[in-house]
Amino acid sequence: MTASSSLFSCSMHMEVLTPKISKWPKDFVSCHSKISYVETNYLKSTCYPISRFLCINNLSKCDKMIKTRQRDGIHCFSEGQKFQLDDVIEAQQFDRDILNAIFEIARDMENIERNSPESQILKGYLMATLFYEPSTRTRLSFESAMRRLGGEVLTTENAREFSSAAKGETLEDTIRTVEGYSDLIVLRHFESGAARRAAAIAGIPIVNAGDGPGQHPSQALLDVYTIEREIGKLDGIKVGLVGDLANGRTVRSLAYLLAKYKDVKIYFVSPEVVKMKDDIKDYLTSKGVDWEESSDLVEVASECDVVYQTRIQKERFGERLDLYEKARGKFIVNQNILNAMQRHAVIMHPLPRLDEITVDVDADPRAAYFRQAKYGLYIRMALLKLLLVGW
């Protein structure tokens, strides 16, 4: 006998492991839901018979609105049902049903942020942000998201230098220690695969906030959400990924998510030394996604609904600064690119920006990158709510 959800499935004879469960306040009750699934390839196959807990007290007006939208069938997941993921590690974890449901909750979070500053959805929960690489938007948006939902934050600035990692402590030991202080860890690390290692030993949710040149799944979620809000659709779009495609984790995760949608075409525009890696191109081909490499940004911009610009990542070049200088400045979004773009199209950027988008572009309504950063708050509010209290 096999039970399944829209995202995962597992046979009942498979090994049953203890689910990750955080510390729960006494005024929480259990809502049972038979959900079984297999996680992605970085963790063992797991079956969970019990949902996460759902708070029943101190719901604000907007909190109650979320429950009403769920009862009205805005998305296909039941109120109180456990979120299908224990951790957010890579973009491949999400299917279209999950993405659509997350986006609906993100819209609810917009209402909470605007109309319900006293939300208590995550009251009693602690989130730890553990960042081994610099961050402004990702760290602050996660911390803002947690506090706007009534939760608390433990944070460390530059954990690579100012934590016990500087004394030689392993990532695994740090995770085991920090999980004793918190209910969820948001981790950024300089090594690809670090979030996967953390999730394998942690008993609480791990959110990958960027692992070296690997992935940045929450950024990809907010990017796709931004496209939906700005363009109005996700099927049938054309997206130009521009800049450092070899080292940029955001473009890798975004490519994985775009492959979930129909009739998407992706253009890769980059200097020769930072071209998109073959694993992404092979993945897109395997999913039937049309992609093309080009060196003509003007032509690509004229075709695309989205021009997604990225900076050349100097920190990934090590001592080969000659290669960095060779790549820098080759593809710049300026007035010439704006003139070539369609009127409905938008320019996106994960930020920070250096000189790859000229400042005069900011005044054009098609410059969506600061709106994109704001959408990230709502996506991260939605993720924290789902990981800690479920649908």
From Swiss-Prot:
> Which residues hold carbamoyl phosphate?
R137, T138, R188, H216, Q219, L351, P352
Question: What reaction does this enzyme carry out catalytically?
Answer: carbamoyl phosphate + L-aspartate = N-carbamoyl-L-aspartate + phosphate + H(+)
Domain of life, per lineage:
Eukaryota
Q: What class of enzyme is it?
A: transferase
The entry's localization annotation reads: Plastid, Chloroplast
Give me the residues that bind L-aspartate, please: K167, R249, R311
Which annotated residues bind UMP?
R137, T138, R188, H216, R249, R311
Name the Enzyme Commission number(s) assigned to this protein.
2.1.3.2
GO cellular component terms listed in the entry, alphabetical order: chloroplast
Pathway assignment reads: Pyrimidine metabolism; UMP biosynthesis via de novo pathway; (S)-dihydroorotate from bicarbonate: step 2/3
Supply the alphabetized keyword list. Allosteric enzyme, Chloroplast, Plastid, Pyrimidine biosynthesis, Transferase, Transit peptide
**GO BP terms, alphabetized:** 'de novo' pyrimidine nucleobase biosynthetic process; 'de novo' UMP biosynthetic process; amino acid metabolic process
GO molecular function list: amino acid binding; aspartate carbamoyltransferase activity
Q: Which PANTHER family match?
A: ASPARTATE CARBAMOYLTRANSFERASE, ORNITHINE CARBAMOYLTRANSFERASE, MITOCHONDRIAL
Question: Which family, according to UniProt?
Answer: Belongs to the aspartate/ornithine carbamoyltransferase superfamily. ATCase family.
NCBIfam families tied to this protein? asp_carb_tr (TIGR00670), PRK00856.1 (NF002032)
Role according to the record: Catalyzes the condensation of carbamoyl phosphate and aspartate to form carbamoyl aspartate and inorganic phosphate, the committed step in the de novo pyrimidine nucleotide biosynthesis pathway.
Listed under subunit, the entry gives: Homotrimer.
Q: What is this protein called?
A: Aspartate carbamoyltransferase 3, chloroplastic
* Organism in which the protein naturally occurs: Pisum sativum
At the highest ranks, the source species' classification is: Eukaryota, Viridiplantae, Streptophyta, Embryophyta, Tracheophyta
